[in-house]
Each structure stands twice: as C-alpha cells, then as structure tokens.
C-alpha cells in the first residue's frame, strides 16, 4: 500500500518522447499587427514570426529576442541565419523549393556545414498543411484546426505537431514559416 501512496514522477527521458503541439494564429494576445504567434496548449506564447518585408522575416522567442532571420533569395530559395534581420550571423540552413505541381509543393532543407542530413517538406501551403520528413520518419506536421460539425474550416489557425527527435523546436517553426510563405 505504501507504493500506491508515493507520488508519480515521470522520467525526463519519457517526456522527451512525447509529441509537442504548438498552435499558430495571428490573433494571440501580445502579438503586433501582422505577426504570427505559436502558442502551447495553455495559450502561452512560445514563438513569434515577425514580417519585416515580403522577403525578410524574424523568428523571436516569447520575450521578443531574435532567434533567426529568414530571408528569401530567388527562385524559391530561403536562408535561415542566427540573429535578427540587421545582424545576420551564421547560416543555419537553406530551403529550396524542388517541386510545385498544382497546389502541392515540395522543398528540400539543407543544413549548413552538414551534407549528411537533409530534410524534405511536402504539403499544400494554401491549406496550411505540410509534413517535414527526415529520411523515413516524420519530424513535424501541420494541420488546420477542425471542429465537429464545422462545414467551413478557417485557415487562420493551425496546429503544428513536433515529434520527438533531435531537431530544435525553433528550427521546425522556422521551416514551417518558410514553407507557408513559399
């Protein structure tokens, strides 16, 4: 009986194996006009995507500190650098659109300095739907927020599910932002 009264403490290793859901919307509290916010299930703001221009964006943490700058180059090529837009530091990754058929888009993510691991993003930007693959496994996936008995599904809110693995959540959010901008 003494064993049943002791409180349960989950193993931190087990917690790292649980998928994380972030909810994206432009209407979260604390966002400026034009910002896209990513909140956890408790509606606490985790990341902010701020648009500087059509080709420049910044990914900020919840306190407004710049994590990455996202810049569009040409022909569907995007670069992700550490730091804010004015002080772009180290190149982290490059995203290149490899296929666009009708509404489906496919992009390849190449990490700077690492030629071994490339990711592939496949989906439909208009429907806020994409899946990020690392070889055979799914890294993350987005989907619109469906409700029961809802005929029309708005595209202003969507869910980002990040599956357990070795990729930082802020990188996944940046890749999704790049994919949706296209």
Curated annotation (Swiss-Prot):
Gene3D superfamilies: LURP1-related. Pfam families: LOR. InterPro entries: LOR (IPR007612), LOR_sf (IPR038595), Tubby-like_C (IPR025659). It comes from the Eukaryota. Disulfide bonds: none annotated. Might be related to the phospholipid scramblase and tubby-like superfamily of membrane tethered transcription factors. Belongs to the LOR family. This is Protein LURP-one-related 7. It comes from Arabidopsis thaliana (Mouse-ear cress).
């Amino acid at each position: 009986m003494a064993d049943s009264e002791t409180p349960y403490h989950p193993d931190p290793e087990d917690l790292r194996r649980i998928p994380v859901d972030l909810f994206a919307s432009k209407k979260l509290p604390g966002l400026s006009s034009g910002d896209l916010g990513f909140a956890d299930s408790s509606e606490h703001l985790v990341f902010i995507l701020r648009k500087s221009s059509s080709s420049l964006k910044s990914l900020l943490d919840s306190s407004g500190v710049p994590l990455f700058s996202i810049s569009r180059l040409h022909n569907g090529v995007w670069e992700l650098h550490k730091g804010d837009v004015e002080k772009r530091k180290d190149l982290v990754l490059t995203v290149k659109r490899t296929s666009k058929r009708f509404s489906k888009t496919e992009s390849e993510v190449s990490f700077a300095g690492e030629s071994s691991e490339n990711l592939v993003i496949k989906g439909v930007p208009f429907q806020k739907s994409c899946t990020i693959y690392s070889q055979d496994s799914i890294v993350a996936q987005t989907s619109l927020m469906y409700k029961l008995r809802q005929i029309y599904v708005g595209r202003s809110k969507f869910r980002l599910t990040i599956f357990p693995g070795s990729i930082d959540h802020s990188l996944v959010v940046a890749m999704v932002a790049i994919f949706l901008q296209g």
